[in-house]
């Protein structure tokens, strides 16, 4: 689906996600429910950062073919993931749950970029709406179509920051965001996890908090209420504020 047709559906987060891994997933070490969730979040963050770093290129009206193909973004995302994991490249060939989920995720990354080549390469158009938040949402939707019975990745945020109705937190997420991730004593960057139902099914749920960086403030900073480039009012956020959750 063309991003140009969906500019008004920009999600709030250039920096966030909520992740659910359904049972049964019990394993040891780096194949635990928790580690699978963290790895999926890390891969999504890695791919999203590639799109973020290429915003100037994507929105350059003077360039047609940007060379930013699905294969290029996928490869760069894997490189960033590997660096974030201390040099451990993802295993995308095994049949265990983690490998299957990561493989489906990198395939979704490739597919979304390929589906939006016309938008990315459209000449004589500056802002195209193919921003990290929209990219992440489309990747999550593609991933869910293929792996929704086993895992789900979602980008959400505190309710007052939600711009896209699809990203609204459910009741469990709202409670965890308000009572844990937003609590004064919560260690910044600490991940929240718990066994809790999702849509009537048992699941292991992991919330990875993300905080506004300087680059987020162009759309989510001050002055509060001023319209950003997407046409949404800014939230008045500051660097370090909780901006969302994977």
Where are these regions (language model features)?
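Sec/Tat signal peptide C-region and signal peptidase I cleavage site
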Residues: 21-27
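Extracytoplasmic c-type cytochrome modules immediately beyond a signal peptide or single-pass transmembrane anchor
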Residues: 27-211, 225-246
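The canonical Cys-X-X-Cys-His
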Residues: 212-224
């Amino acid at each position: 689906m063309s991003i140009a047709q969906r500019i008004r559906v920009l999600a709030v987060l250039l920096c966030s996600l909520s992740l659910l891994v359904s049972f049964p997933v019990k394993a040891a070490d780096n194949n635990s429910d928790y580690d699978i969730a963290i790895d999926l979040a890390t891969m999504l963050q890695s791919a999203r950062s590639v799109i973020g770093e290429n915003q100037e290129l994507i929105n350059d009206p003077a360039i047609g073919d940007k060379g930013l193909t699905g294969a290029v973004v996928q490869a760069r995302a894997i490189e960033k993931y590997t660096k974030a994991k201390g040099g451990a490249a993802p295993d995308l060939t095994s049949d265990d749950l983690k490998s299957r989920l990561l493989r489906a995720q990198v395939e979704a990354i490739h597919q979304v970029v390929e589906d939006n080549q016309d938008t990315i390469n459209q000449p004589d158009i500056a802002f195209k709406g193919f921003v990290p938040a929209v990219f992440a949402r489309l990747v999550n939707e593609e991933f869910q179509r293929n792996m929704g019975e086993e895992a789900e990745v979602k980008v959400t945020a505190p309710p007052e920051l939600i711009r896209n109705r699809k990203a609204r937190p459910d009741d469990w997420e709202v409670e965890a965001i308000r009572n844990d991730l937003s609590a004064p004593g919560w260690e910044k960057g600490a991940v929240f996890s718990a066994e809790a139902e999702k849509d009537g099914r048992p699941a292991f749920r992991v919330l990875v908090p993300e905080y506004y960086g300087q680059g987020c403030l162009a759309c989510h900073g001050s002055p509060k209420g001023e319209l950003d480039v997407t046409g949404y009012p800014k939230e008045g956020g500051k660097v370090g504020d909780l901006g969302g959750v994977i």
